[in-house]
């Protein structure tokens, strides 16, 4: 489905040598050095540059939300999308600060937006089915979502973009993400479920029960990652998964945000493991299962700020660190350049 090349180790030694001979002790820049190595392997060992980076926020509603798994009703998804378009959300503040161009994609919010809203229409439906009662969507919808996401990535790639950052908005989407995590990692559903938007103990218990119910209901159909998306996914999770795979196929870096985006990354890795090479995990969120999911994918996040918002906020906040890794690799003098003998 996606022809993703594993990263070649051909130039890894030369890249590491360039990092090691900068005017610093070996390893002194810590995790930035590993990040620079990854970026240079993806974008090229000679003067890699991040060009036309994009923050893509995917929005959709979830049928399970009507069963009371969140403090917020489903209507808040559309209200927050309008807030994004008005420039008033945290993701707007952070993308403006770090110089990321933001776009918002409607993958399946309950009510469609006006054509002049500025929201990109990639709707797969008006919210998913309630996953604890029936499948979220058809397999055809999953495939259509992948195609839509790939078309959007291709457009950005044609315009010179070589890095995308992923965010999301969707009341109820931590429930789908937790169910996906449980199925694909084997971790008990109860250990994947977090408080999401800050629910109370009774709501938390109901959320755990409904997710366990969803996993049990669909267990006979969950042996394929595409079917996992169809049974327990979300329209925005589908399109984030497609975007990851399409971007990796085109040799682009993909910055993963929090728990929901990481669930999409987990599905993508199960579809084609080579896409993992192109992912940068921006942060570990405060959501209960996120650190276990990151551990499963052998991902070391750049930040750990206790964030629990989504929207792409962690990915935006990590972007200056990604740029710093590029800049030190390209601009920092070597001992030889500086005339320093050790």
From Swiss-Prot:
Annotated protein name in UniProt: Nicotinate-nucleotide--dimethylbenzimidazole phosphoribosyltransferase
Entry's family note: Belongs to the CobT family.
BP GO terms, sorted: cobalamin biosynthetic process
Domain of life according to the entry: Bacteria
EC number: 2.4.2.21
Lineage, highest ranks first: Bacteria, Pseudomonadati, Pseudomonadota, Gammaproteobacteria, Alteromonadales
Gene: cobT
Known catalytic reactions: 5,6-dimethylbenzimidazole + nicotinate beta-D-ribonucleotide = alpha-ribazole 5'-phosphate + nicotinate + H(+)
Signal sequence region: none
Enzyme class, UniProt record, top EC level: transferase
Keyword Nucleotide-binding in annotation: no
Role of this protein: Catalyzes the synthesis of alpha-ribazole-5'-phosphate from nicotinate mononucleotide (NAMN) and 5,6-dimethylbenzimidazole (DMB).
Organism listed in the record: Shewanella piezotolerans (strain WP3 / JCM 13877)
Catalytic residues identified in the record: 311
One family name in Pfam for this protein: DBI_PRT
Record pathway: Nucleoside biosynthesis; alpha-ribazole biosynthesis; alpha-ribazole from 5,6-dimethylbenzimidazole: step 1/2
Gene Ontology terms, MF aspect: nicotinate-nucleotide-dimethylbenzimidazole phosphoribosyltransferase activity
Keywords: Cobalamin biosynthesis, Glycosyltransferase, Transferase
